Regions:
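Intrinsic-disorder-associated, low-complexity terminal segments enriched in Asp/Asn/His/Tyr and depleted
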Residues: 1-3, 12, 16
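Formylglycine-dependent sulfatase
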Residues: 5-9, 20-443
Length: 445
């Protein structure tokens, strides 16, 4: 916007014969902004990646992208729950400022996001797939939406599919937190079908020509439960996966708030009764989860190849980002899913690759999901949205000493006995402190 105004003022000061020269000069002096592709998954445990050192989970495409980019190995969500974490990422504000703590929260339409900032400097901001928006506004700064969501009907060609996808229709409750281990194994699922449609839409879009610089966000629902992987990938992990050492954690290891999150039973499909979750169930869930991650990695490889072709075809520079809204403990500490400040739930993968990003670099300083938007604005000279709680990660690319003492916050509103207990986590250096209000137990360090 500012560039446009400056150009307009300059043109008004020139004679007709000079206008063409001024326009050419202005356009040639303005640095080209990189196109951006941001793959944003749902519920990917940050430590279940090859590039993070996991010995079993295979993620060759992400590993290759990470080796040619910068990895933030201590990145965290602002809230270990979908809508609050995603709202924080888009707005750059903590849940205590967005006032969104549950999956029913709605971002006000007059709330600025980093997409608005990118749009103001000429970007076409495109949403392909999941963002878990609630309410009538399904854009929040996106100028185009080429694929709808699976849990909320939005714009795009496949937004209505959720009504026809079996387990996400009449059996929706069975794949929520309470029933996440009721369905697991190898096969097909609404998650796999939805993500396939998301990737098809992304590949189709990247096969087209676009005049404006692009910021494309590809949102997948995988590897969110139900824990169902393609059969071949489930078999690959089924006999190799182990039960986490922390599965049987008891006593002082748990804060009272996390003790209540332990998954002790599942529903017997034949009788409908609650039965104890066995170690075999844990292995099955983890084998499927690992298979879903590898499946997602394959899809990322496909879209990355199309992205590289798009950049080459249009002679443009590109920036690639991968992250997730939160993690999944998947049996660690006896818990499945999110809702806690354990590393498996609160930590997120965060990788930058491409224009302006160092290769083969790992940053150990803590980073937050609320830093992503500010970083993209910084890398593209876009104005930052107002009232930001985060900070650009760009200084971390150059080993700025001021970044060594970074700290990040994560917030969660725990529901307990018909009351809410707000909790906070702070990570600085190698320490993490967790505390809940209205708790009968002190914080954990």
């Amino acid at each position: 916007y500012r560039d446009t105004v400056c150009a307009f003022c300059a043109l008004n000061r020139k004679t007709d014969s000079e206008i063409g020269k001024e326009t050419v000069l202005f356009m040639s002096e303005r640095p080209a902004r990189p196109d951006m592709l941001f793959v944003f998954s749902d519920q990917h445990n940050a430590h279940y990646c090859g590039f993070d050192g996991h010995e079993l989970v295979e993620t060759p495409n992400l590993d290759r992208i990470a080796s040619r980019g910068t990895v933030f190995e201590s990145a965290y969500t602002a809230c270990p729950l979908c809508v609050p974490g995603r709202s924080a990422m888009l707005t750059g504000q903590l849940p205590s400022h967005t006032e969104i703590y549950t999956n029913s929260g709605i971002i006000p339409s007059d709330q600025a996001t980093f997409l608005h900032s990118l749009g103001s400097v000429g970007y076409e901001t495109v949403l392909c797939g999941r963002m878990h928006f609630k309410g009538p506004d399904q854009r929040h700064g996106f100028t185009r939406r080429i694929m709808g969501d699976i849990t909320v009907v939005g714009g795009g060609r496949f937004g209505e599919w959720r009504k026809e996808l079996g387990v996400y229709g009449e059996h929706n409750l069975r794949v929520g937190m309470a029933g996440c281990v009721d369905i697991m194994g190898g096969g097909n699922s609404p998650v796999l079908e939805y993500d396939r449609a998301v990737m098809e839409a992304a590949l189709e879009y990247l096969g087209q020509h676009h005049e404006k610089p692009q910021c494309i966000v590809v949102g997948t629902y995988g590897p969110h439960f139900p824990y169902v992987a393609p059969p071949e990938l489930y078999r690959r992990y089924r006999d190799r996966v182990e039960v986490p050492v922390s599965w049987a954690d008891e006593g002082d290891v748990h804060h009272p708030m996390t003790e209540e999150k332990k998954q002790r039973t599942r529903t017997d499909p034949e009788t409908g009764d609650g039965v104890p979750v066995s170690e075999e169930d844990v292995r099955a869930a983890r084998a499927a989860y690992f298979g879903m991650i590898t499946h997602l990695d394959r899809q990322i490889g496909e879209v990355r190849e199309a992205w590289d072709s798009y950049l080459e075809r249009n002679d443009r520079e590109g920036l690639f980002i991968y992250s997730s809204d939160h993690g999944d403990t998947c049996g660690e500490h006896g818990i499945f899913g999110k809702h806690t400040f354990f590393e498996g739930s609160a930590a997120i993968p965060l990788v930058f690759n491409g224009a302006g990003v160092p290769e083969n670099k790992t940053v150990s300083s803590p980073a937050s999901i609320i830093d992503i938007g500010l970083t993209l604005c910084d890398l593209t000279d876009a104005p930052p949205p107002p009232a930001q709680d985060g900070a650009s990660l760009r200084p971390c690319f150059s080993d700025d000493d001021s970044q060594k003492n970074r700290h990040v916050l994560s917030e969660w509103m725990h529901s307990r006995e018909d009351a809410f207990a707000p909790g906070r986590m702070i990570r600085r250096g190698r320490w993490k402190y967790v505390s809940f209000a209205h708790s009968d137990c002190s914080g954990l360090l």
